Amino acid sequence: MEKNTVLLQDTEAFMHGELDNVTVQQNCIVLDLVQGGYVPYGCYTSAPIPMPLFDALRVSWNAASPEDTAVEAQVRVMVDGNWTTWNSFGKWSPSLHREGPPYQARGPVQRWPDRLQLDSKYATAVQLRIYLYSKNEKVSPAVMLLGASVRMVDVIPARGRLVNERLHLSLIHISEPTRLL
């Protein structure tokens, strides 16, 4: 059985991604500290993650977000060998009104408040991104986990599936009708 969930949740996993104004410390992604203060924003982007063929995805994250900080999770998927645009699941913080973004459709991608769904297409990889924001240079949000679960699809090959190796037919004898003169 193929794995349909990926979780990035420790220093080793996070270090495979791209760090932009963020660093990894104590198994968490945090904003960079420059001259005694945290930078106002930063971004972590995972390496591309191959997945079994899928048509829907849910993003998960765990973060500590003190007052005046927020995080924003985003995802993109590979469809027909090309990456879709990034899809945001909104900014989240205890100090913000919590709600997912409204439904949006772009090409084959439908982004619902809690999931990404593909319309008549399938994806083969996922890439995760999370922005960290702070209005206070003394505090930073901390991301402990970033993950995704996909709904795998089973596609019938173009040539079809074999039902049985052999087609079992019983012999039937058909006689010709007799002609009357």
Description of each model-found segment:
Residues 1-168:
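Beta-strand-rich ligand- or partner-binding modules
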Residues 172-181:
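Single conserved hydrophobic/aromatic residue that forms the stacking wall/gate
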